[in-house]
Amino acid sequence: MAGRDESKKSQFSKLHHLSLVVKNMDEAIKFYESIGIGPFKDYPPLTDYVKLNVQDETGFFHLKFKIAQVGDIQIQLCQPGEGKSPYKDFLEKKGEGVYHLGFVVDDVDDSEAELRKLGLQVLSSGRREDGSGFSYMDTAQKAGVVLLVRQSPGGKQKKPK
C-alpha cells in the first residue's frame, strides 16, 4: 500500500469484536439467538476501570453490554442508559447499528500513541489497574465507523518506566 511503512505492524490487524447499539437489549438478544447468534452473556463490569476519559461517567457506567462469540469474533450489543454517551448520541442520530470495530493490541498505551502520530484523535479511553483498557479513536467521519484499540486484562503487562 502506497505511503505505508510495511515494517510497522498495523494497530488494526487483530479484529476482536463488533459493537452494535440497540434500543432494547432483550428484543435484540431474542432476535440474534433466533437466527443462531449467541448465547449472550454479561460483559465484565465497567467498574473495573480506574482511569477514565469519557464524555460522562454516569452515561459510561449505565451502558448495558451483552456479548456472544461467533468464531473468533465477539459480537457486543450495547444499550445506552441514563446519562450522556457516544452510544446514546449514535442511537439518537442514526438509529441502531454498528458503532465500532474493536481491535486487540499488545499495549493499548503504545497503540494509542502510534495512532495519535498518524493524526487520529482519541474520543474516549479507560484503563484498568494493570494498564489494560481501551481507546476509542475518532474515525467515524473518514471510516464510517469508530475504531477502537483494546488490551485485554492479563495481557502483556506494562514495562516499568
Tell where the protein language model's regions lie, with residue ranges:
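Vicinal oxygen chelate
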Residues: A2-K8, L15-K23, F65-Q74, F90-D107, D109-K161
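The feature marks the first
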Residues: A2-S7, K14-L15, K23, I37-G38
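Short, flexible, solvent-exposed loop/turn segments with mixed acidic/basic and small polar residues
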Residues: D5-S10, K88-K94
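Conserved active-site tyrosine of GNAT-family acetyltransferases
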Residues: A28-Y32, L115
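Conserved acetyl-CoA-binding loop of GNAT-fold acetyltransferases
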Residues: S34-F40, L118-Q121
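Conserved short beta-strand elements that form part of the metal-binding/catalytic scaffold
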Residues: G38-D89, G133-G155
